[in-house]
Amino acid sequence: GVNLYHWFLEKQGSYGVSVKIDAGDAAKKTVLPDEVPEVDLSAKYVPEGMSWIDEYHLQYPEHGMTGGFSFSFVLLDKNDLGQVVQDQNVIDSEERTFGKYQGIYLKYNSITENGAINQRIYLVCPDLYRVLMIYIGDDVSKDEAIKVAENLVIEGNTTMVKTAGLPTWSGEMISEKTEDDNAEISTSVNEKKLPIYQIGDTFDLDVIGENTNGEYLEKTISAKVDSVQISDDLQLLDPDKIPQEWAEAIDADGKLSTNTLNYVKSGDGIDSLDEIVKSEEVNQKLVYVTVTYTNHSNEEIDHMLYLGALLTLTKENGKVQLYIPTEQAGDGYDYISWTGVAKTGEMVYYSVSENYGNGGNYISSIKPGESVQLNMAWIVNESDLKNLYLNVTGDGASYEFSEYILKKGLVDIRK
């Protein structure tokens, strides 16, 4: 029944494509069963130096969590047949047979060759009622990508899973296209509505943790940003806690390397691609923040979650405007892309952690009247230092004014 299913790939303009799966009449009548087997995936060919880091990721270990292959199965339902999925910024595409499966290869335009996922292969596996979606990094050549896909072993095992509620091919692809349009995000606010604290100010904070019996706890404590230090190296950090990509961003003289900013004019993805209109080098700086949390409540808080997030804000005419450094448009360009490690948002480095929860950013215990001092750090572009604010509410918001930020405020750490 495999060859009853086929892909259609149609070009639109220079860089647009329409993709759909179709099938013979018999296949069109096939009803998706209530249960289908789980799928086991392996490969008879793995590029030299690559290894499986879990059952769905094949990567070069030295590239960390970027690039390589990422595999994802979705259901193939008869409603998926004939559904057209539009795609843009495609610079190479072909329909072909991969081993015993019909499939499509797509390569996308990517401004930075830096761990980007810039290729995809879709395979239809009708005997298992699945489509396999393979996302492939720019550290893999087209030939290697095709060779891996041709040598995949895709088999159902004895565990059955219910099909109700599982993602389907067209549902997944169409939701991917609409995801970005729905969210209402607040990025501008009247400055009277935004509480702002200075370095050295003490303010209240709601935190979550557990009591000594292991039960969920919400308490109000106080927080204070004691100091902010700016550095062009990583000497302030605990060497054991330095993220690998930061360590790799140090140049020969021990300083943070510069960041190449590419100013990009957007194409429409069909007749034109994004293009770099100018580039410049900027310095990257370490932002090292010391914060003290004090428990004023009458109860010990165990496994207290803490989280710092960095925002970039500008003020004008009584309005505070949040901007995302990469999303700034200007004269002749629509956004900025870069190769360095500079990044606002959630803290990347933090000095206190415990083996608990997701990410370990917990204070294991803070008794009534006790204070805990800790450090958080980011690397940012020097040009953003004059606009930095810190969110320690614990919600991690950095790309919008969340209700916690509007209630509990931000700390002005501009330099």
Explain the meaning of each model-derived region.
Residues 58-61, 69-73, 116-119, 125, ...:
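Extracytoplasmic/secretory soluble proteins
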Residues 2, 6, 15-16, 22-28, ...:
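Conserved functional micro-motifs across diverse proteins
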Residues 63-68, 114, 127-129, 216-220, ...:
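Glycine-centered tight beta-turn/hairpin loop motif at sheet-sheet or coil-to-beta transitions
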Residues 77-84, 113-115, 139-144, 233-234, ...:
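A short local loop/turn or secondary-structure capping micro-motif enriched for an aromatic residue
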Residues 83-90, 142-153, 304-305:
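Surface-exposed flexible segments
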Residues 25-120, 276-278, 303:
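Short, solvent-exposed recognition patches
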Residues 110-158, 283:
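Short, well-structured beta-strand
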